Amino acid sequence: MIFKTLWYYWRARKRWKFANRQQLEQHQWRELARFRHRVLTKSPYFSSFGDLSLVEYPLMNKAIMMENFDQMNTAGLKRDELLACARLSEQSRDFKPTVGKFSVGMSSGTSGQRGIFVASPKERSIWAGTLLAKMLPNGLFHGERVALFLRAGNNLYDSVQNRWISFRFFDLFADFNQQVQALVEYQPTIVVAPAQVLRALALKIQQGEASLPPVKVISVAEVLEPQDRQLLKTVFREVGEIYQATEGFLACTCSHGTLHLNEEFLHIEPKWIDESRFNPIITDFTRETQPIVRYKLDDILVVKKAPCDCGNPALAIERIEGRNDDQLILPALAGGTVNIFADPCSRIIANTLPLTSDYRLTQTEWLLKLEGDCVVEVLQQCQSALSDYFAKQGVDIDKIEWQCVSQAILPDLFNKRRRIIRK
């Protein structure tokens, strides 16, 4: 398997490089045509749409995928058998079991429903080779030691173990302090973890409770917000980001720190919310066992206005704002409601709070509860700044009730972090 991984590593690093947008789009359409002919014809579900153009295929989401999984996949796999395998692995914390040759994992269920993802040995090699090509700063043969702080392991991660690079899985369901001690003993060169875990690790280093050499850290599984990035940059040598979901390896940061969509193996249709924000509709033409075709994500992406100096023609993303259900919906002065994006709220709060303070803003009907590990007077300053912003957006702020609560915001390492929540 190592030779296949090396091939896909070379392909991602050297072969699938494009000088301009036109070359990239020509490559996408060639790969999509091959994907439709070689893969979708093997799926009972997708083969029924064979005469349609791609944009005429029905949209997918997690609920549709799970409901039609047995007909969608190309290997005759059964959803319930896969779910049983994945659940057993999560309960036992042993992620070696497979269903035949296929690795199985489960999503975290942030959107309310857990999904499953399946990978063949070939797909594991593609994933591993591509990830290594994009995220290793010194290349494959530099002897990197990579620490993976994840909620669940998977055979995907074991597929890249070799004499040139070592990976170690750190279980987020285990005692965090013990895991940090094991991390110090491992002395990694790269740490991959959710943003809240990297934040907790940075605070431990700042407080003298842990000692690590200068390392590159890569945020995964959660939105890396500006205040967290700023904190991490004060502690670690380099801060990168991977945007990955059950649906695929969607984006990663380049050498200039810009998040680029992985359009070399994804076709992305933007569903525009306004002139700069969109929900991505993705088709992954490298996924053969579990086809991902016109899958609509609830994540809100903001396009970077200026082109990135790295020269990558793939779409550059300014930031990931979170999910549609992270928006606040507040009463409007003119009647009805006003949708307030989470990102401006996060920035207003972050600009007021101390760098090491965390917070949570929760909406329940017209009640906004702001919790933070700082004095209540600072939270009240945040309330005032948010109210001013809401008023400029046409919100009837007199109808909003506030609660400011000074308390520690403990990291919930078992679940994806959401700082702004609408119930």
Would you name each region that the model predicts?
Residues 108-111, 162-164:
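Acidic/polar active-site rim loop that often engages polyanionic ligands
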Residues 105, 109, 129-136, 147, ...:
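A broadly conserved amphipathic alpha-helix scaffold signal in soluble, globular proteins
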Residues 48-52, 158-160, 210, 232-233:
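Short loop/helix-cap segments at secondary-structure boundaries that form the rim of catalytic
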Residues 114, 154-156, 287-290:
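Short, acidic Gly/Pro/Ser/Thr-rich loop/turn segments
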Residues 1-30, 34-35, 166-423:
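Active-site glycine/GP-rich loop and adjacent strand/helix microenvironment
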Residues 1-106, 112-126, 132-137, 141, ...:
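Nucleotide 5′-phosphate-binding alpha/beta core
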Residues 119-120, 150, 195, 243:
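Glycine-rich, histidine-containing beta strand-loop boundary motifs that form or position
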Residues 132-170:
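Conserved AMP-binding loop of ANL adenylate-forming enzymes
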